[in-house]
From Swiss-Prot:
Organism encoding this protein: Caldivirga maquilingensis (strain ATCC 700844 / DSM 13496 / JCM 10307 / IC-167)
Sequence similarity: Belongs to the anthranilate phosphoribosyltransferase family.
Protein name from the UniProt record: Anthranilate phosphoribosyltransferase
InterPro entries, alphabetized: Anthranilate_Pribosyl_Tfrase (IPR005940), Glycosyl_Trfase_fam3 (IPR000312), Glycosyl_Trfase_fam3_N_dom (IPR017459), Glycosyl_Trfase_fam3_N_dom_sf (IPR036320), Nuc_phospho_transferase (IPR035902)
Keyword Metal-binding: yes
Positions with a binding annotation for anthranilate 2: 165
Protein task: Catalyzes the transfer of the phosphoribosyl group of 5-phosphorylribose-1-pyrophosphate (PRPP) to anthranilate to yield N-(5'-phosphoribosyl)-anthranilate (PRA).
Pfam families named in the record: Glycos_trans_3N (PF02885), Glycos_transf_3 (PF00591)
Keywords, ordered alphabetically: Amino-acid biosynthesis, Aromatic amino acid biosynthesis, Glycosyltransferase, Magnesium, Metal-binding, Transferase, Tryptophan biosynthesis
Length: 339
């Protein structure tokens, strides 16, 4: 580890293999706490590079509890979190909607850190058992098109890093690689990024990892979601190619709203906001949901144009009983399993 620390201190980039070996040493507790803290802080201060993010992601994928997904069209909507703006849990409701509309979704996520409602909190409030075993997760995915992979359960080695991360109290490279380490090794994903400045690095890292189709999104005024409050910056990764562009709500056929209209204080408020949106009585919530679901449908190859995805969601608005029945049924299936 010391040669790597010296390399970082000199401002040099670690190779993918060096980063991978460093991450493995940390995850397997072969590195001391001081070395781990020094490496994480050194990378953050200098700025993480693509090979380093890819190397850490490779190690995290290797040490996870695997869900043996073989379908290349399964998607995820996990993001970095950390925007601190306490918006409704749109990535999870969008994942459920995408599944209802025919896409297989293996949602990877955790409890809230900086938001009012993390994906795990939101799903628990809906009645889901968030700790299903891999065989149940795969069964749910194949039979019901939706399953959840609770990050602490599927990445047990991460508990070895938590004491150092808590003491540091800042964003580290592990915040970046967590969303890139879905236990099903999905090849398609909408990945929200709270920190716009790292999107290019994450896009390059995703190209090294080997995604078929990945959308990195960062929306105004600083959310790790597709925004209906201003512009959304997007890095679109297909294999080794990366395209960068910006979209605005009117391009999706949506209005521009105020962020305060989708802020919630707890998971139950997030559910109520989603229900009101899909009833057609909360336009801001509906448009926020539609924009993010549209990108999930697009990355899955279900629609060729995100505007068609928006239209698919709008058709549910005002007549969402079947959708909520679907959600309740999937939640009931999850409760039959106990880890």
């Amino acid at each position: 580890m010391r040669p790597l620390l010296e390399k970082i201190a000199r401002g040099l980039e670690l190779s993918l293999e060096e980063a991978y070996n460093a991450a493995l040493a940390i995850l397997k507790m072969e590195a001391g706490e001081a070395e781990t803290a020094a490496l994480l802080m050194g990378l953050r201060v200098r700025g993480e590079r693509a090979f380093e993010v890819a190397g850490f992601a490779k190690a995290l994928r290797e040490t996870c509890l695997r869900i043996p997904v073989n379908d290349p069209y399964v998607i995820d909507t996990a993001g970095t979190g950390g925007d601190g703006l306490r918006t409704m849990n749109v990535s999870t409701i969008s994942a459920l909607l995408a599944a209802y509309l025919g896409v297989k979704v293996l949602k990877h996520g955790n409890r809230s850190v900086s938001s009012s409602s993390g994906s795990a909190d939101f799903l628990e409030a809906l009645g889901f058992n968030i700790s299903v075993k891999p065989e149940t997760a795969l069964l749910m995915l194949n039979n019901h098109r939706f399953s959840f992979a609770f990050a602490p359960m599927y990445h047990p080695a991460m508990k070895n890093v938590m004491p150092v991360r808590r003491r540091l109290g800042i964003r580290t490279i592990f915040n970046l690689v967590g969303p890139l380490a879905n236990p099903g090794l999905v090849r398609r994903q909408v990945l929200g990024v709270a920190e716009a400045g790292i999107m290019g690095v994450m896009a390059e890292a995703a190209g090294l990892i080997g995604y078929d189709h990945l959308l990195l999104v960062h929306g105004e005024p600083g959310i790790d979601e597709v925004s209906v409050f201003g512009r959304t910056m997007i890095y679109e990764v297909k294999g080794n190619s990366i395209d960068k562009y910006v979209i605005e709500p009117p391009e999706l056929g949506l209005r521009i709203h105020e962020l305060r209209d989708v802020v919630v204080s707890n998971p139950m408020e997030s559910i109520e906001k989603a229900k009101r949106g899909l009833m057609g009585v909360d336009e801001a919530a509906l448009d926020f949901i539609a924009a993010n679901t549209a990108m999930a449908l697009y990355v899955a190859g279900k629609v060729k144009d995100p505007r068609d995805g928006v239209e698919a969601v709008k058709q549910i608005a005002g007549n969402s009983n079947d959708f909520w029945s679907y959600v309740n049924n999937v939640a009931a299936v999850s409760r039959r399993d106990s880890a």
